[in-house]
A protein has these predicted regions:
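Short amphipathic helical patch at the helix-1/turn junction of helix-turn-helix
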Residues: 7, 17-19, 47
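Short basic helix-loop element that most often maps to the first helix and adjoining turn
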Residues: 11-30
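Recognition helix of helix-turn-helix/homeodomain-like DNA-binding domains
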Residues: 33-46
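DNA major-groove recognition helix of helix-turn-helix/homeodomain DNA-binding modules
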Residues: 51-66
Length: 78
């Protein structure tokens, strides 16, 4: 299908949250989303908006590129 690239954004939200010994609910409250949003994001089943990705990176005091990664479809089909 034209325009369906299949690219994705993967993340290390789980790793950063666990290092801080935080629950999903605590992180969700800190960045203004639901616990379910954090859950699906950690499973890489949801790509956050740029604003949410920036909020999360800011919360953990790291560059957005430390947590979120753009992956092209052809890079995942090795």
């Amino acid at each position: 299908m034209k325009g369906d690239f299949g690219d994705s954004v993967v993340n290390k939200v789980y790793e950063y949250r666990v290092l801080r010994r935080m629950s999903q609910k605590e992180l969700a409250d800190a960045v203004g989303v639901s616990k379910q949003t954090i859950f699906v994001m950690e499973k890489n089943n949801y790509s956050p908006s740029l604003v949410l990705a920036l909020r999360i990176a800011n919360y953990f005091e790291v560059d957005i590129n430390e947590i979120f990664f753009y992956v092209r479809k052809d890079e995942t089909n090795d």
